[in-house]
Amino acid sequence: MLQLEHINLVVRDIPTTLAFYQAAFPHWFVRDEGQGEWYGKSRNWLHFGDEYQYLALSDHGEGENRELSGHQVGLAHFAFVTNNLDAMKARLSQAGYQIAKGGSIDAYRKNVYYLDPAGFEVEFVEYLSDNPKERNLSS
């Protein structure tokens, strides 16, 4: 078995970024937090997730996140699967977050993109089929 354990995001402000992910994942919790040093720079860090996966947030970021419409090397986006995209959108809307980019709706999936407060593009996808071949078809 192989699965993703965590994503480590460097942000400027942990509480602001955490609020977005708390709205998206109300069942997740702060697993641990503390202070440390990252290559000579002090930082606060926090792990937010469940017993199996989490987001690591650190507040020692400098500069701006990658321009998503550009062609720079770096993270374009990451995605989470949900079994109810409409409920996800409603939670984020109620918390004051707007859709950054509408996704596709086809026979086998629907998705949507948000920008978190740190500027990372986050995709949420709901699959409408249990068949992996259908899920992975290109539109």
Model-found features: residue ranges?
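Vicinal oxygen chelate
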Residues: R31-G34, K89-S139
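Short, charged/polar surface micro-motifs in flexible loops or helix N-caps
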Residues: D50-Y54, G61-G63, L85
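Residues that flank catalytic or metal-binding motifs in active/ligand-binding sites
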Residues: Q3, S42, E51-Q53, H71-A76, ...
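N-terminal beta-strand motif that seeds the catalytic metal site of vicinal oxygen chelate
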Residues: M1-L18, L75-F80, D130-S139
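Residue-level recognition of conserved beta-strand positions in structured domain cores
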Residues: L57-D59, E126
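Core segments of cupin and vicinal oxygen chelate
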Residues: N8-Q53
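Mid-chain, well-packed structural core segment of small domains
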Residues: H71-G74, F78-L92
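A short, acidic/glycine-rich surface segment
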Residues: V30-D32, G40, E62-E67, P132-K133
